[in-house]
Amino acid sequence: MLLTTYGTEYDAVVKTMHLYIDGCKQGNSRVMRPAFHENAGFFGYAGPDLAIGTSFLFDWVDKNGPSPHIRPRFVSVDILETIAAVRLEVDGWSGSLAGPSVCMSDIFTLLKTPDGWRIIQKAFHWHS
């Protein structure tokens, strides 16, 4: 991939990721839904329970409510033509379900579609 193409694609991937981040900050799944492909996968443990499916994520975000002070950090963004992998660390989660301060480690896989970059998979670890 040419460096100029990589820079353009990097910006587009990060823009998609910010839809997810903004939805988390606002506690509003409608903000983040456009970032996800309609058939996206979602897996991880929320405490001792295995969480599966984007419907779990969207419901959780809406029920948790706003978490305006989260601190997201892109650990890595790897892009290969039409696929991307993003590792995201998010500190400072708060809200009715998260509690006072929780850290999340996320690994996302994105696919470049005709409509832009979309999250096709999210796996997470909740640090308690």
Regions of interest found by a model, annotated:
Residues 1-30, 34-38:
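Short, low-complexity N-terminal intrinsically disordered segments enriched in polar/charged residues
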Residues 5, 12, 41-100:
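Surface-exposed, charged secondary-structure patches
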Residues 15-16, 69, 105:
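Short, conserved clusters of charged catalytic residues that mark active-site
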Residues 33, 43-45, 120-121:
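Short, hydrophobic secondary-structure boundary micro-motifs
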Residues 36, 90-92, 123-126:
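Short beta-strand segments enriched in hydrophobic/aromatic residues
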Residues 103-128:
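Short beta-strand edge/turn micro-motifs at domain boundaries
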